[in-house]
């Protein structure tokens, strides 16, 4: 049976969402909130927007409020990740970027200014991206020893220079 033009036009991301029933739900907490958006159909994350103006001095940090609440799909958490343009152009990074499945507060983004100049955040600026990732909730088991591996306890550059 041939595909209709409408069915063929459905994006891969919409098909994937329809198949797993996943939905990232959100609530605007104020008139200052901007709905999360994706920059393209295949973008991994949803852009998060500042609800207010902030000034972040060099080598300082700020919790930038979005004035949105979110509910990530069941079995997921939200990872708040940096936007590459802010990192490259302004030395802005994101910290403490985990939103648990059961968190329902105002989403705040910790922005670090590693630059030498103050950084101005304006209301409506894209400040970070929210990526929904699957998570496992394993039971915690204390044991006497762990199995040996080829790598062993080597870390911090032990597997090679590059």
Swiss-Prot record:
The modification Phosphoserine is found at residue 11. Phosphorylated in vivo on Ser-11, a reaction that can be catalyzed in vitro by CDC2. Keywords: Hydrolase, Magnesium, Metal-binding, Nucleotide metabolism, Nucleus, Phosphoprotein, Transit peptide. It holds the Pfam family dUTPase. It is found in: Nucleus. GO terms for cellular component: mitochondrion; nucleoplasm; nucleus. DUTP binds at residues 83-85, 97-103, 108, 151, 156-157. GO terms for biological process: dTMP biosynthetic process; dUMP biosynthetic process; dUTP catabolic process. One of its GO terms (molecular function) is dUTP diphosphatase activity. Pathway: Pyrimidine metabolism; dUMP biosynthesis; dUMP from dCTP (dUTP route): step 2/2. It catalyses: dUTP + H2O = dUMP + diphosphate + H(+). InterPro entries: dUTPase, dUTPase-like, dUTPase-like_sf, dUTPase_trimeric. Its EC number is 3.6.1.23. Its cofactor is Mg(2+). It comes from the Eukaryota. Homotrimer. PANTHER family: DEOXYURIDINE 5'-TRIPHOSPHATE NUCLEOTIDOHYDROLASE. Catalyzes the cleavage of 2'-deoxyuridine 5'-triphosphate (dUTP) into 2'-deoxyuridine 5'-monophosphate (dUMP) and inorganic pyrophosphate and through its action efficiently prevents uracil misincorporation into DNA and at the same time provides dUMP, the substrate for de novo thymidylate biosynthesis. Inhibits peroxisome proliferator-activated receptor (PPAR) activity by binding of its N-terminal to PPAR, preventing the latter's dimerization with retinoid X receptor. Essential for embryonic development. This is Deoxyuridine 5'-triphosphate nucleotidohydrolase. It comes from Mus musculus (Mouse). The lineage of its organism: Eukaryota, Metazoa, Chordata, Craniata, Vertebrata.
């Amino acid at each position: 049976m041939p595909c209709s033009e409408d069915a063929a036009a459905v994006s891969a991301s919409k098909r994937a969402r329809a198949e797993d029933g996943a939905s990232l739900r959100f609530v605007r907490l104020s008139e200052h909130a901007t709905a999360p958006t994706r920059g393209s159909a295949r973008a991994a994350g949803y852009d998060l927007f500042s609800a207010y103006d902030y000034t972040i001095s060099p080598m300082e940090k700020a919790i930038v409020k979005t004035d949105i609440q979110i509910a990530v799909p069941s079995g997921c958490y939200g990872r708040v990740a940096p936007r590459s343009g802010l990192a490259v152009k302004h030395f802005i990074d994101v910290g403490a970027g985990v939103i648990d499945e059961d968190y329902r507060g105002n989403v705040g983004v910790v922005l670090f200014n590693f630059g030498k100049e103050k950084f101005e955040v304006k209301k409506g600026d894209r400040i970070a991206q929210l990526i929904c990732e699957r998570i496992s909730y394993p039971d915690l088991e204390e044991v006497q020893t762990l199995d040996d591996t080829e790598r062993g306890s080597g870390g911090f550059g032990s597997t090679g220079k590059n």
